[in-house]
Amino acid sequence: MTMFNRISLPVLLLVLVLKSAPAASYEVTDKLSFGGILAGAYQYQALGDSLPKFGDTGRGAVPFQFEVSYAPTPSNELFAKFGFAAGNGLNDGTSPFYLAPWAATLEDDVKDINGSNRDYLLTAWYKHIFTFAGEQQLALTGGIIDATDYLDENAYSNDEYTQFMNEALVNGPQGFLPSFDIGGAAEWEFNQFAIKGVAMNVEENDDGNNFNYYGVQFSYVMESGLGEGNYRAIFNITSGDFLNLAGTETERLKSFLLSFDQELGDIFGVWVRFGWANDDAARDWQSLYSGGINIKGSGWQRPDDTIGIGYGFLDGGNMGIDNTQVFETYYRYAVNEFFAASADIQYMKDSMEVGGNTDGWILGVRLTTEF
């Protein structure tokens, strides 16, 4: 099947969803509901003459995720999410950069997930919620889960389908949060405080080793005259199953992240994400310093539109990268409550400890429908 045919079918589905979305019923019953997201993006990289092996070229991809929820009672829920995609965009090796220009779950990501021989089933879990006096709540989840559903959240920098596309501005790349494998999560909320913990067993890492992951997030919601602010601290650690640079021993991965977002009135918002990691194992980056501005379209009578401006600096680890820089800005135009179109511009630069540097621009267009 050609790339055109593999992409044209999801594009046709995108058109059909757009035509039917306003009339769709998402709650089949008061207990059963479904939803999903269908996106299509095309990105073109402009590298100039410095990297003739890669060159100026473009690629597209169309991911589709469908989810179903069954909640027999308000305290119990069964949930499953399936992922399909046509194409890998510039993530297929076309791009010379170490960071993925689009952090979406694309064609290669939904097949043989984590070396498990499982295709398309991203998450499947059961959750039970315990409610206590004094506005306390404890939710326990078990099954196939995604650590990023619980940890390293951010109101303005956490969604590759509606916000920034570059992986450094979606989550902390040095934070190694795993997705789509067996595990459990606990979420405790008390007034403005929350603690979330995740434990997972991941089938296979890049070294081919099975490993355990543990993460915990402490968060606080602050209400002020400026608006709502969310302040989070995240700790991550794995079992010692990651090869060191020499490939002679296995080590643990450890990291610490801070993820803050703060409203500045009705139009503006700001965010930062800082992170640090050990380099006992082979690591591309050891630290991250990123931040940006979110601007709502209320200022020009487009309240559902958004402008995002973000920058990230990643200090290299022990794999030969001195540092990586990424700048990204996007305009998201909301056509209606279901569909939006985004224009996206990225600049990336990988500075190496030895040898030349790689830099260039990536121009993108993204269409997204949520239902």
Where are these regions (language model features)?
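Outer-membrane beta-barrel "beta-signal"
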Residues: 293, 339, 359-371
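Surface-exposed coil loops of outer-membrane beta-barrel proteins
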Residues: 93-125, 132-217
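Repeated loop/turn-to-beta-strand initiation elements of outer-membrane beta-barrel proteins
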Residues: 32, 75-78, 134-138, 192-197, ...
